[in-house]
Amino acid sequence: MELTILHLYPDTMSLYGEYANIAVLRRHLEAMGVTVNLVKVTSEDVPDFTNADLIYMGAGTEGTQKAVLLGLTHHVQALREALDRGCLLLFTGNAMETLGRSVTDAQGQVWGGLGLGGFRRQAGQAADVLNLLGIQ
């Protein structure tokens, strides 16, 4: 079995050393006999979700989160198409917030989200603990 993991923005969305999450995931998959192809997409690249089986994005600062959100807005249709064909998303920390309808920052400015989930997020709001977010 072969699995392609697309690591989105490891250069900017790596607040807590997200490379280690990917390394552990890869090691466990390979121990199970899975061949892992890791594709890193930096903020300088145009993301291509065509062959991705899993898309991973880690947490970033509030500023990098907004920059990434603005960049991904241009690729939301391609991201939807990847989800429609069965690609999985694993977004940690504030990266998950980008998937909702909006993110309101500490100054009250509302940023449009990618709209893949029906939730909204506000700075200072108690974090929801989710085991799984199923996006339909």
Regions found by a protein language model. Give the residues of each.
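Cysteine-nucleophile active-site neighborhood
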Residues: 62-133
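Conserved anion/nucleotide-ligand pocket segment
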Residues: 136
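N-terminal beta1-alpha1 cap of cysteine-dependent amidohydrolase-like domains
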Residues: 1-84, 122
